[in-house]
């Protein structure tokens, strides 16, 4: 039983015992007091997740019975169980005390009692300041009730303490604010929104289609009933939608010119009385009725000091200067000063100035400026519209005799179309007549669309207006990433999206959040883009009706009145959408950089002048909808040149090889600028470069991989220093590139031809058999195939760093330690069936392992290794310094570098006996033994004294590793020929067994599998030739 269940079970017993001991029950307040006296602590409401005592007892129907009291209170009585029935019966038989009985009133209670019975606690009134804050919060967007506390704290910097206002729960607060807040039930929960004006109009009971607000001038003439004068008034409907609505009081019969003067006067008095009634009733029920009359007079006094009008933005400042006190609209319950002025339309009049593009406030008692003055009509989002005369009719002519020559009709609206129309205004006398189309200020106060901008459209404060997305930071050369090809124009012009935790997964999370946000109809309507914001280069979002998702888009060009062409910065494609589907993008959705990266396939150019349709179609089929392995080559004019490889099949597919084999492309060793992106590059036009410290793809920098890359740089720097200091072991000097134009290392001829090996043709790709050496550039990047066993790929494996030379000195290059699928030298013992793990122990360079020193034996300058291969337990990296002979200079770019190789570890599954003395048996069983092997040859530094011909003499040798012993013995047995054979078999990819490579989806993109060993244009992979034949062309073709 959990702690919470134990507390609840104990609480049920305590409450039952308290209520059983009371014959007449307890109220919730009495229960709290009794519990505090008995236990010494308050009821554990918060611990159990309850907000009030009533919620607690209602959740215990088997313990507490809620009964209504005679005076309207709630009485809680206990429901006894089997063990407490006897106690309950005894308590029920108890007599009431004499004192209590005497205090009870005798006889029937008096009907005319002067005491009002208690009907329960009356909920307090929500203060105007709190109501204003709630309106301010919900004006931005609706808020779920579960998120209300967080939203309020984020908006105002404090929590919403409703208890200090006298409320017991949030439910009472919402009831008190029901005039401005409505609660809607959605799937996500209760949604709090601002109430619409239409609902208020219906609640007031006005006729359909008519909206009544305060008139411009109201005189207090006593209190009037809100019933009969209002309901007797009938108004005619507007004649036309184009004309301003004119309200004319319709009467059963119009008085004729020959009517009696007394009758006419009586009728006029009735009309005046009706007019006053209208003004009084509307003023009393509107928001302006809550403003203190003394404050109204002060505001009117300030405005009256400016006959030419006071700008609404200066009203608060002038009020403070005049009366030395601040005027806060929020403390009065208004959202802003505009809402306050709108509520005081009985004493203030508002006009819009075309010259200053601002609102002017006038005293309603003052006459306006004559027509043609600096003031003109108020357009959309303003408070009033120009005056218009009503048509002459018998009723207005009769009213003109009663000191009114003209009926000034003030038409005001919030929903008028955008027009720069200027119409003459009519003079408003001190006592205006009926309002033809009433001012809709009180109706609109609850709408968040109040705006004083001249643009006359409500723009959400968090909407993106003139902001651009950032691009992803450039990737380092030789970085290995997982990519999706999103949009293809040609092999020289396509877009990729990096697959990682901090790129693709963040994009998915953002799209899910955008769908949740914009799917709300209220939010979607609020973020509609007006016509004048739809301009090329504007960042916004759009929903695709086919898949119901929202995407970030950038407007590229406007196609017509209804359609625009947009660019998708996260996917790279361009599409056509409707203008009506565009929405403002919230600022929080601009933090994620644009995910689409413009790319060009490295080292290829079209066979003809342009890419053919068949070449593009074939490239699209290669990419498909699957993750690919990509290695960064370089950036040219901001375009990423990248190699692509598909590792999902049994054999790795290199896209540049396939395009060249099909005759669609020519492989070259240089990257040419993309012509397509040079003509049109949307990311360069519409996005900004990422900042220096903005590293988004942190998934490429997992602690393991980032540590690995950092140590790579340190090792390379230290290795370069060792080269300069002469500490390294016989480095090769770089040869000029002219010596490598033929790309044939004819000097390194071997004794046996690889073509004679029957397994050579089997393992060699068919499409690469007939390729000529001249057609394949030197050092083409390749991805080594790896046999996958039954072990589980460990995502936390990380490459280790190489050490060479003396203890603690770094190795400049790391040997390819993946021996999977290659021929192995083994003894007659079985391969160890155990898991190997990476070790961070420092490995010392063994001078006896020098593969290119062995190669010198071919040319006669034999350089014999000085001892066996030393090994260390629980290490998985082989430290090798590859050094060609100085007699055969090579290009330094063909030497493998540290970051070209990734190390994999595969368990051995099958046992095979190998003969130590017969190399032929080694070759025979090599294919079978290559399926499962150790992924690396651990190297341990030996002192010069320990260099002997047997592996047992090595202090770092393994005790129970037959594979390592056999390899060491074979190397020590035949240092010249056997070591060369071993090296050639290790480095020869023709003797691999290509099996399917599985890439776990959750694995970091920098570790995309055991076969993730690619060379790049700056770090070319160079396979050293074997001694199996005199021709190297077939071997190099197999590598390619």
Swiss-Prot record:
SUPFAM superfamilies: Tudor/PWWP/MBT. One of its GO terms (biological process) is transposable element silencing by piRNA-mediated DNA methylation. Disulfide bonds: none annotated. Residues 7-80, 122-197, 291-365 form the HTH OST-type domain. Gene3D superfamilies: 2.30.30.140, 2.40.50.90, LOTUS domain-like (3.30.420.610). Required during spermiogenesis to participate in the repression transposable elements and prevent their mobilization, which is essential for the germline integrity. Probably acts via the piRNA metabolic process, which mediates the repression of transposable elements during meiosis by forming complexes composed of piRNAs and Piwi proteins and govern the methylation and subsequent repression of transposons. Required for chromatoid body (CB) assembly. It comes from Mus musculus. Coiled coil: none annotated. Gonad-specific. Mainly expressed in testis. Present at low level in ovary (at protein level). Residues 533-592 form the Tudor domain. This is Tudor domain-containing protein 5. It is found in: Cytoplasm. Transmembrane segments: none annotated.
């Amino acid at each position: 039983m959990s702690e919470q269940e134990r507390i609840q079970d104990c609480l049920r017993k305590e409450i039952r015992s308290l209520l059983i001991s009371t014959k007449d029950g307890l109220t919730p307040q009495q229960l709290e007091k009794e519990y505090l006296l008995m236990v010494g602590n308050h009821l554990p409401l918060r611990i159990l997740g309850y907000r009030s005592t009533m919620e607690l007892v209602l959740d215990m129907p088997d313990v507490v019975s809620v009964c209504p009291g005679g005076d309207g209170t709630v009485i809680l009585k206990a429901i006894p169980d089997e063990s407490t029935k006897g106690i309950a019966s005894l308590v029920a038989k108890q007599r009431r005390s004499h004192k209590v009985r005497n205090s009870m009133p005798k006889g029937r209670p008096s009907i005319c009692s002067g005491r009002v019975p208690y009907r329960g606690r009356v909920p307090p009134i929500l203060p105007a300041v709190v109501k204003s804050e709630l309106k301010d919060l919900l004006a931005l967007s609706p808020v779920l009730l579960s998120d209300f506390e967080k939203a309020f704290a984020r908006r105002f910097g404090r929590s919403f303490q409703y208890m200090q206002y006298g409320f017991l729960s949030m439910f009472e607060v919402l009831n008190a604010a029901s005039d401005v807040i409505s609660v809607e039930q959605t799937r996500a929960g209760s949604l709090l929104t601002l109430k619409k004006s239409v609902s208020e109009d219906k609640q007031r009971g006005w006729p359909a289609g008519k909206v009544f607000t305060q008139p411009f001038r109201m005189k207090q003439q006593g209190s009037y009933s809100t019933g009969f004068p209002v309901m007797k008034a009938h108004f005619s409907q507007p004649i036309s939608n184009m004309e301003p609505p004119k309200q004319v009081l319709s009467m059963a019969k119009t008085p004729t010119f020959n009517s009696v003067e007394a009758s006419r006067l009586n009728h006029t008095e009735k009309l005046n009385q009706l007019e006053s009634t209208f003004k009084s009733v509307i003023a009393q029920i509107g928001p302006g009725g809550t403003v203190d009359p003394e404050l109204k007079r002060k505001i009117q006094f300030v405005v009256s000091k400016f006959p030419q009008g006071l700008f609404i933005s200066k009203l608060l400042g002038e009020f403070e200067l005049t009366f030395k006190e601040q005027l806060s609209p929020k403390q009065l319950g208004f959202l802003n000063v505009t809402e306050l002025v709108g509520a005081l339309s009985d004493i203030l009049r508002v006009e819009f100035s075309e010259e200053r593009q601002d609102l002017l406030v006038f005293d309603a008692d003052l006459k306006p400026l004559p027509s043609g003055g600096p003031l003109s009509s108020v357009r959309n989002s303003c408070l009033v519209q120009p005056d218009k005369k009503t048509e002459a009719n018998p009723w207005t002519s009769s009213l003109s005799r009663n000191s009114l020559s003209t009926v000034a009709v003030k038409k005001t609206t919030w929903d008028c179309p955008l027009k720069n129309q200027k119409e003459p205004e009519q003079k408003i006398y001190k006592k205006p007549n009926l309002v033809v189309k009433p001012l809709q200020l009180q109706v609109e106060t609850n709408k968040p669309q109040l705006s004083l901008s001249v643009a006359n459209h409500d723009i959400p404060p968090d909407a993106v207006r003139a902001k651009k997305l950032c691009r992803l930071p450039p990737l380092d050369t030789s970085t290995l990433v997982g990519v999706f090809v999103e949009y293809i124009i040609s092999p020289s012009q396509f877009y990729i999206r990096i697959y990682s935790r901090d790129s693709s997964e963040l994009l998915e999370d953002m799209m899910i959040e955008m769908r949740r946000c914009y799917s709300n109809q209220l939010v979607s309507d609020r973020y509609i883009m007006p016509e004048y914001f739809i301009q090329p280069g504007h960042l916004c979002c759009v929903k695709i009706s086919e898949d119901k998702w929202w995407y970030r888009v950038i407007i590229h060009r406007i196609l017509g009145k209804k359609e625009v062409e947009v660019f998708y910065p996260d996917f790279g494609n361009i599409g056509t959408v409707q203008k009506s589907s565009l929405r403002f993008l919230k600022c929080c959705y601009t933090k994620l950089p644009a995910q689409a990266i413009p790319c060009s396939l490295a080292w290829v150019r079209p066979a003809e002048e342009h890419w053919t349709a068949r070449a593009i179609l074939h490239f699209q089929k290669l990419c498909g909808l699957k993750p690919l392995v990509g290695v960064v080559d370089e950036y040219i004019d901001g375009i990423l040149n990248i190699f692509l490889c598909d590792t999902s099949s049994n054999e790795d597919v290199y896209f540049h090889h396939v395009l060249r084999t099909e005759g669609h492309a020519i492989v070259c060793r240089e990257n040419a600028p993309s012509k397509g992106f040079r003509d049109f590059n949307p990311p360069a036009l519409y996005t900004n470069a990422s900042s220096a410290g903005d590293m988004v793809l942190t998934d490429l920098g997992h602690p393991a991989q980032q540590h690995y890359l950092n140590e790579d740089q340190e090792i390379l720097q230290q290795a370069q220093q060792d080269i300069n200091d002469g500490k390294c072991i016989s480095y090769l000097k770089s040869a000029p590139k002219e010596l490598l134009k033929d790309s044939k290392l004819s000097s390194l001829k071997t004794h046996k031809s690889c073509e004679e090996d029957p397994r050579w043709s089997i393992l060699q790709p068919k499409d690469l058999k007939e390729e000529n050496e001249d057609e394949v550039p030197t050092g083409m990047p390749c991805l080594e195939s790896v046999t996958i066993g039954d072990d589980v790929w460990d995502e936390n494996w990380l490459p280790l760093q190489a050490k060479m030379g003396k203890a603690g000195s770094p190795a400049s290059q790391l040997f390819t330690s993946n021996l999977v699928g290659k021929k192995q030298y083994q003894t007659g013992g079985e391969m160890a069936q155990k898991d190997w793990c990476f070790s961070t122990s420092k490995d010392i360079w063994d001078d006896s392992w020098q593969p290119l020193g062995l190669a010198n034996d071919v040319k006669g300058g034999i350089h014999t290794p000085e001892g066996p291969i030393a090994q260390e337990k629980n290490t998985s990296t082989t430290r090798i310094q590859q050094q060609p002979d100085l007699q055969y200079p090579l290009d330094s770019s063909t030497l493998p570098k540290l970051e070209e190789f990734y190390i994999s570890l595969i368990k051995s599954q099958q046992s095979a006996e190998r003969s130590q003395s017969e190399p032929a048996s080694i070759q025979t069983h090599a294919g079978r033994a290559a399926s499962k092997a150790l992924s690396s040859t651990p190297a341990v530094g030996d002192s010069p004294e320990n260099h002997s011909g047997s592996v047992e003499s090595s202090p770092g040798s393994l005790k129970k590793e037959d594979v390592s012993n056999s390899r060491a013995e074979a190397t020590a047995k035949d240092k010249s020929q056997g070591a060369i054979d071993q090296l050639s078999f290790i480095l020869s990819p023709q003797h691999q067994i290509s099996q399917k490579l599985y890439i776990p989806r959750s694995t970091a993109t920098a570790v995309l599998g055991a076969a993730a060993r690619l060379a790049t244009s700056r770090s070319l992979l160079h396979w050293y030739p074997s001694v199996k034949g005199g021709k190297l062309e077939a071997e190099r073709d197999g590598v390619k």
